[in-house]
A protein has these predicted regions:
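Internal alpha-helical scaffold of NAD(P)-dependent oxidoreductase catalytic cores
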Residues: 50, 120-129, 145-182, 195-232
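Rossmann-like NAD(P)(H) cofactor-binding subdomain of soluble oxidoreductases
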Residues: 34, 66-67, 71-148
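Short acidic capping loops at alpha-helix termini that bridge into adjacent secondary structure
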Residues: 45-49, 105-107, 213
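Short pre-catalytic strand/loop immediately N-terminal to key active-site residues, enriched for Gly-Thr
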Residues: 130, 180-185, 237-242
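NAD(P)+-binding Rossmann beta1-loop-alpha1 motif at the extreme N-terminus of oxidoreductases
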Residues: 3, 9-72, 144, 206-207
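Small-residue helix-packing motif on alpha-helices
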Residues: 49, 60, 92, 211-218, ...
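NAD(P)-dependent Rossmann-like dehydrogenase/reductase catalytic/cofactor-binding core
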Residues: 3, 14, 18, 220-284
């Protein structure tokens, strides 16, 4: 199925990120974040992307206006080279009922449905090539942490497309599918843990009399700066924490109080709960 450039005779990759026709099934937050990131990064021409969601035509129309993508009818799925499942895992069977007649084995299928295995998507698409992803909402600002795995019918050309699509949108890691539930709990759900910490810090400062907007600005910059230091220093979070925790100082007092209140245990409990839920979704 390799494509050839008639004018040069050069053999092109099976999946060329600049020429594929990419159809999104679903127009929720993750689909919107993905579209925004792909358009802003210039990864895929907007006119090569379409969004299919007859249940929410208003959102599709807005995405078309904002990003120049096609608010597509289901029939457009026939023309697509790559179909991207961006629906909730619970609605995957319904999506297959609605659009299954457009699924053919010569297409590539991408999925971000938590807990839905490559095998399940393969079974619904005639044993086509499938790549399963777990990104997060930071796709929209090209700061996502994304992991992916290949289905049994996908090979290195599909892996190359996965890298080409997601590398401009943040950090990308290829992993065995067995680790995708862990990724879901860590980086897929992780932004919500971060936001919860932000909320708690802002509320604490506001309750202490600080202007809420000032508290927000200081909190966001503090956490952004701390993350940047870890990324660029190469040191472990433990080493960095110990370095700034002076004996009998304010940081030591604060960290000790957090741990006494069960901070680390609470984070681990949240991670494990999200991981279990990912596994449960895959069984529904």
């Amino acid at each position: 199925m390799d494509k050839f450039a008639a004018e040069t005779g050069e053999c092109k990759m099976k999946w060329d990120v600049k020429t594929i026709r990419l159809a999104f099934i679903g127009s929720g937050f993750m689909a919107q974040a993905m579209l925004r990131g792909l358009v802003r990064s210039g990864t895929v021409p907007p006119e090569h992307m379409g969004v299919v969601n007859p249940v929410d035509p208003e959102t599709c129309a807005r995405l078309s206006r904002e990003y120049g993508v096609l608010a597509a009818e289901p029939e457009w799925l026939r023309q697509a080279d790559v179909i991207f499942f961006a629906v909730k895992p619970q609605t995957f069977p319904e999506a297959c009922q609605m659009y299954g007649k457009y699924f053919t084995a010569d297409k590539l299928y991408l999925t971000i449905m938590a807990g839905v295995s490559c095998a399940a998507v393969e079974a619904a698409t005639g044993n086509a090539a499938v790549v399963r992803f777990m990104p997060n909402l930071a796709l929209s600002v090209q700061k996502s942490a994304t992991a992916y795995c290949l289905g049994k019918h996908a090979g290195e050309e599909e892996a190359a497309l996965a890298q080409a699509l997601f590398s401009p949108l943040g950090v990308v890691a290829r992993l065995p599918e067995a680790q995708l539930s862990a990724v879901t709990a860590l980086s897929g759900s992780g932004p919500a843990y971060f936001y919860l910490l932000c909320e708690a810090m802002i509320e604490s400062a506001a309750a202490d009399g600080m202007n809420r907007e000032t508290a927000r600005a200081l909190t966001v910059q503090t956490l952004e700066g701390a993350a940047a230091l870890i990324a660029f220093s190469g040191e472990s979070p433990t080493e960095m924490r110990r370095r700034i925790t002076s004996k009998k100082g304010t940081t030591e007092a604060g960290v000790a109080a957090l741990e006494e209140a069960g901070f680390s245990r609470a984070v681990q409990a949240g991670y494990l709960a999200a991981r279990r839920r990912s596994d449960e979704l895959g069984k529904q």
